[in-house]
Every structure is written in C-alpha cells, then in structure tokens.
Amino acid sequence: MNYYGYDFYIRNDSGVPVKMDWGLGLKRIEPDDSVLLVQVWEVIGNGVRGFDVMPDSKYWSNIDSQYYRINKVSLYSEDESLIREWTLETKDDGGHQLFSEEHWKRYDYKLKIESVIRKWIFYITDEDLSLP
C-alpha cells in the first residue's frame, strides 16, 4: 500500500497529539486496546473519501462490545489550518463503523488503497469521543 507520507494524529488522554502509524491499512497505538483505530483514506480517481472507525483490536473479532461514538471529525492541513469538519452518525455494523461523504458503505479492511497523494493531519479530540 502506498500512503505517500500521510501523517495522522489522535489526541491522547493528556490532550497531546500522538502520531499514528499504518499497519495493514489500520493504525494502532499500543499498548491500550481501548485506544481508537482510525483509518482515513481518499482514493483519487473515483472520488471516494471516508473514515473507517473502530476500537483498537489485533483482530476484528471481540470488538462488538467496544463501540466508540464519534460526533465530529476535523481535518487539518500540515500547517494545522482547518480544512473541513464532518458531523458523523453512529452505525452499529458488527464493530465496523464507516462514514463517507455520500452514504454508508461496507468495505473490507484489506481494501487496496492506491494513488493516495494528499497529506492530512487528522485530530479527534477527547470531547469528540464517548463510550456508549
């Protein structure tokens, strides 16, 4: 997979932005399994843009009871200028929550992502996260 230098950040409990790394298309912050996994992708060519959101887990099983509710997502440019904000719905989809600009759609986590050329800084603040 090619990500062309994307940088993604999530604020930790202290409010400090923590850079996330890619792994099989997913990001994991160790060691806390309750930390949120966020996959942000944009596929140039078909206009698909979305956010794939779930709790951290080494496997996709055993996460059904660990939903996060995300109310707002803010995209920032590299200089931290706000680009756009989205208000997200919450959908119970077997532990897999996905928001796209047009509609909900199910994607396999092994989705091959090609031609990703933009660089974003992605923040989710503590107040945007809440457990059910």
Language model regions located:
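Intrinsically disordered, low-complexity segments enriched in small/polar residues
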Residues: 1-9, 19-132
